[in-house]
């Protein structure tokens, strides 16, 4: 699941980078070759419209790239998906940082399911929700996730997870504010 989640995030980030290059090329009167993968150096040369979340949102709205009626490949739509995934991760880590509930620690599968139901399930089809249920059953044990944050015990994990959660909360709150300000929270 961690590998799958990481791959989906990488794909969405790459899409935003490609959109940035296309936007930059159009701004300079050139056509962008969609088949070429952008390089880090190319990003430095691209238009400044994608230098921040706010500038990307404003540039895409101004250019008419975002459609509120049907799905389009836009940085705003992709950012919204990343934003929802960030909420899922934050909620899952909050659960992982908590102590025993009624004498027992929840499994990562239970924590992921709880977070999924809040953050992602409302935006997914029935079939995708059912597939997610299967994934939750296959998640590794808590120790695996603790090792991901370089700790061995729950006691060691809690303060580190709280720092990570605080950073995720800051990013989520700022992005939420920008998306809400431009009424982008329910893009198709």
What does each of the following model-derived ranges do?
Residues 1-188:
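Long, contiguous alpha-helical bundle segments
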